[in-house]
């Protein structure tokens, strides 16, 4: 269920402060954050965030298509190794 429009998008205060500081200074350094729940706003376009996935920080460069999504959507938390090969077919060869 989506968030109410009258509430507006949720962005952690500490993330917004870092974004505003980067915009004022024109600094393009990576912004390190654990806040996967923060919504990407238009002010964040062009910035790079290091989003924590539970183990390490994944760099996420924000583009216009990402506005409205959450930071955590672009930092996968699970490693997919692919489906295991069939052991029976290997044994026959």
From Swiss-Prot:
Pfam families cross-referenced by the UniProt entry: Ribosomal_S19 (PF00203)
Keyword annotations of the record: Ribonucleoprotein, Ribosomal protein, RNA-binding, rRNA-binding
Family designation: Belongs to the universal ribosomal protein uS19 family.
HAMAP family, alphabetized: Ribosomal_uS19
Annotated function: Protein S19 forms a complex with S13 that binds strongly to the 16S ribosomal RNA.
Recorded superkingdom: Bacteria
Xref: PANTHER family: RIBOSOMAL PROTEIN S19P FAMILY MEMBER, SMALL RIBOSOMAL SUBUNIT PROTEIN US19M
Alphabetical GO biological process terms: ribosomal small subunit assembly; translation
GO cellular component annotations of the record: cytoplasm; small ribosomal subunit
Record-level Gene Ontology MF annotations: rRNA binding; structural constituent of ribosome
SUPFAM superfamilies the record matches: Ribosomal protein S19
Record's protein name: Small ribosomal subunit protein uS19
InterPro entries recorded: Ribosomal_uS19, Ribosomal_uS19_bac-type, Ribosomal_uS19_CS, Ribosomal_uS19_SF
Protein species of origin: Oleidesulfovibrio alaskensis (strain ATCC BAA-1058 / DSM 17464 / G20)
């Amino acid at each position: 269920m989506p968030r109410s429009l009258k509430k507006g998008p949720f962005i952690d205060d500490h993330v917004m402060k870092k974004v505003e500081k980067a915009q004022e200074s024109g600094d393009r350094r990576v912004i390190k954050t654990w806040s996967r729940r923060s919504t990407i706003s238009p002010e964040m376009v062009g910035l790079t965030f290091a989003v924590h996935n539970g183990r390490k920080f994944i760099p996420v460069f924000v583009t216009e298509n990402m506005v409205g999504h959450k930071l955590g959507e672009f930092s996968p938390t699970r490693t997919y190794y692919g489906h295991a090969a069939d052991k029976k077919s290997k044994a026959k060869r």
